[in-house]
Regions:
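Flexible, low-complexity segments enriched for small/polar residues
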Residues: 2-151
Length: 151
């Protein structure tokens, strides 16, 4: 199928990048997991590779009650603001524990934000990240930023 015309029309539409379309959807735990793995420079994990296997990832997602293809009830997975709250921070800590190794230190806050695909963060988020000098904690703070919680 030829879909480039459709894709082009979608991304050129002003509604695609309008303020009402940006950061209006809360990331699911699976989306956060993928984002954290990508930001750390990891590709898709190979089964049994590294010290953290699929069981660790499954346990983290089970604790968040968000195992793919196994919704908690017939209504499906929680969505929207139901994914936000103190449990979201705990879940993000658990997702960070799935990394096989500490993420590489970034040369700047902008480089770290680019790894997370965050390009328009608040001055508060930027200040918090700039004030932290430990690379691991800085990575964790970026993963827990309000901007990363939504997409």
């Amino acid at each position: 199928y030829q879909i480039m015309g459709l894709v082009d029309a979608i991304v050129r539409d002003p509604a695609f990048t309008a303020d009402t379309a940006v950061r209006t959807r809360v990331r699911s735990p699976v989306e956060k997991l993928v984002g954290i793995q990508q930001a750390a420079g990891n590709g898709a994990p190979s089964p049994g590779a590294g010290r953290r296997g699929p069981a660790v990832v499954a346990n983290v997602l089970r604790a968040a009650d968000y195992l793919p293809f196994l919704p908690p009830n017939v209504g499906g997975f929680p969505q929207g603001s139901l994914l936000l709250g103190p449990h979201d921070l705990v879940s993000t800590f658990d997702l960070l524990a799935t990394l096989d190794a500490p993420p590489p230190a970034m040369k700047s806050v902008d480089a770290l934000l680019n790894r997370f695909s965050l390009f328009d963060v608040s001055s508060t988020t930027r200040h918090v990240l700039s004030a932290e000098h430990d690379a691991g904690r800085r990575f964790a703070l970026a993963a827990m930023s309000p901007e990363f919680a939504v997409t």
